Amino acid sequence: AQKPVAILGSSAMRMKDHPLLLKFIEKNQIPFGSSTMAKGMIDENHPLCFGCIERGKRQMQRKFIQSADLVIGLGFDTIEVEYEAWIGNTPLLSIDIETPDIDESVKLVGEVTGDLSNSLSRLLIYPAAENNWTQSELDTHNKNYNEALRPSTEAFTPFKAIDIVRKVLPKDGIITYDVGAHTHQIASQWIAPEPKVCH
């Protein structure tokens, strides 16, 4: 693949050795996003991170993902959101604890099924794969995405409140929120620097 992206999902939260996710991403220099439940499995301040999928400004995230030539699902559990909703025609390589639950519209081109820590440990033995992503492409997407999440206004808005709370909470501060439309803005906008601090 010349332009792969990785999507981290909730099954990754069960990993015995979750730092392997970062090793895999950094070794191969793959841009990554996450589902809501997997936020922070890799620090979302990482320069390769393009944020949360299928929440606020989902169409922007879908367009970015569909510009890739391969999606690598890393522990992506379709209980959160089905691949069919966002993957488009981009081929899928699934690395998960079970076979992906997909219909024939998803182009599954490869599958690694089993313990995620073991699977990634074995994949890390191989030489790094090169790709054609540039940091400026990712930076441009992230800038546009974050600006779209925070439209210009004089009013005190939910996105301003979220930014204030993020600023005053410590790095390991935990935010919890209930179901509802506000989850889309929070999940997209809140930066999780580590696992299990955003739920």
PLM region spans:
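Glycine-rich phosphate/diphosphate-binding loops that line cofactor/substrate pockets in enzymes
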Residues: 1-4, 24, 65-68, 164-171
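Glycine-rich phosphate/diphosphate-binding loops and the adjacent beta-loop-alpha structural elements
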Residues: 3-15, 25, 176
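Active-site glycine- and acidic-residue-rich loops that bind
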Residues: 10-17, 154-158
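Short glycine-rich anion-binding loops that position phosphate/pyrophosphate groups of nucleotides
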Residues: 10-13, 37-38, 76-79, 180-182
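Redox- and metal-dependent alpha/beta enzyme cores, enriched for Fe-S-associated oxidoreductases
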Residues: 15-37, 173
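Glycine-rich, acidic loop regions that bind phosphate or pyrophosphate groups
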Residues: 38-137
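Active-site diphosphate/adenylate-binding microenvironment
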Residues: 140-199
